[in-house]
């Protein structure tokens, strides 16, 4: 192999010991001398693997409760030594070359994620010797292999088996990149953690004692796929994902069939899935260009799909469909026999439904798994030269949060539709207006520059599909600055309104609702979406 290097001596020191016994046994069987530290050394010895403790190798004991183990010239000289250049000085100082370093780091992320984690706990889980060895081996990848991921053990062993115990330069270089990615992520986590423990700073900072937003944001995403193009065909694109995401998402979903997801597919599927997660009853959300164009809940997902689809069949063409229950055969048949769809995503897919969808080979079918509570990730938006960072909009309202501000009280049925409509409005681009009747959208007005025009668009959409607006409720993601939005809603037949309130002209808006005999409730919470 080109620029291959034989592996004769390896240093193994891992916190995550998954797979290390089998890996070490194979190295030993291939005649590789193994050095190790602390718990790793003990584990290998207990499994009858020939191993030398690092302190015996260096002649210098572990000290300071294990804080100093591998920080020794015999270790770092062996890792950093340049083959063909440093042999004389190595011989003079009794330093032997180390050809393979296998290290993963103290579990800092897991430690600080514990509710009872103290600052002292966090500090003691900051690895020093590990990253030092990792960086040293990665720097000297010309001569040394560095393994930080247990998933690479089989790959390394296979190459050694096929190439007389040697690793090619290409492999060592690739492993070095992974090593630097690993240490960058590790140091970033530490910086983020400590950054939340000091006063905020920067323009307009109020100097809080602690801030959930760190001084710097260090994030790492790994490329999941390259794409044919981005939002438009002249834009290149790729999809990157975070490590260890626990929440069901488009990033973690399994694609069961269909063409590769496009940039727009992923963006729209994310919007559909996050919306359908809001509902506990069987629900269907149909999305086009990241806006819900039809949403419904029902006793089963087939009826929910029927309700969502009839809101706007025209926009549903080529859309994304999300469910919060397993996709069954009847629902799958209803979809594929009726409309062209880009993506269907559900927690799971029945075998019968999968067979039906398979008749449309290009249709992308995703299973995202069940979900529980949403995680508290940041919502991040890129602007030229910076990032806008905020909490995710997980604001919820219940019946107890609603303030009736009109003379007429909403009926029980209206209240149920109001809360449903409010959930949908959170996922519609501002200015957002949503008409709802009987747990299904009737009209959606999205993205207009004036709120009254969003209300008019919702009415036009409903009329185009011959849907009866009379008796529907209306939600608005932000307050009405003028009464014209209420007048437009009344003209369309809206009976009840839910909105945040808070306008300087609230009294005029309330008076307009009273004039039209409408009920109206304030939530005290806004749901702008840009």
Curated annotation (Swiss-Prot):
Transmembrane segments: none
InterPro entries: AICAR_Tfase_dup_dom_sf (IPR024051), Cytidine_deaminase-like (IPR016193), MGS-like_dom (IPR011607), MGS-like_dom_sf (IPR036914), PurH-like (IPR002695)
Pathway per the UniProt entry: Purine metabolism; IMP biosynthesis via de novo pathway; 5-formamido-1-(5-phospho-D-ribosyl)imidazole-4-carboxamide from 5-amino-1-(5-phospho-D-ribosyl)imidazole-4-carboxamide (10-formyl THF route): step 1/1; Purine metabolism; IMP biosynthesis via de novo pathway; IMP from 5-formamido-1-(5-phospho-D-ribosyl)imidazole-4-carboxamide: step 1/1
Protein name in the entry: Bifunctional purine biosynthesis protein PurH
Domain notes: The IMP cyclohydrolase activity resides in the N-terminal region.
One GO location term (cellular component): cytosol
Organism: Psychromonas ingrahamii (strain DSM 17664 / CCUG 51855 / 37)
GO molecular-function term, one example from the UniProt record: IMP cyclohydrolase activity
SUPFAM superfamilies in the cross-refs: Cytidine deaminase-like, Methylglyoxal synthase-like
Catalytic activity reported: (6R)-10-formyltetrahydrofolate + 5-amino-1-(5-phospho-beta-D-ribosyl)imidazole-4-carboxamide = 5-formamido-1-(5-phospho-D-ribosyl)imidazole-4-carboxamide + (6S)-5,6,7,8-tetrahydrofolate; IMP + H2O = 5-formamido-1-(5-phospho-D-ribosyl)imidazole-4-carboxamide
Enzyme Commission number(s): 2.1.2.3, 3.5.4.10
Similarity-based family: Belongs to the PurH family.
Pfam families assigned: AICARFT_IMPCHas, MGS
NCBIfam families named in the record: PRK00881.1, purH
Transport recorded as keyword: no
Biological-process GO terms, alphabetical: 'de novo' IMP biosynthetic process
Domain MGS-like: start-end pairs: 1-148
Coiled-coil spans in chain: none
Key words, A-Z: Hydrolase, Multifunctional enzyme, Purine biosynthesis, Transferase
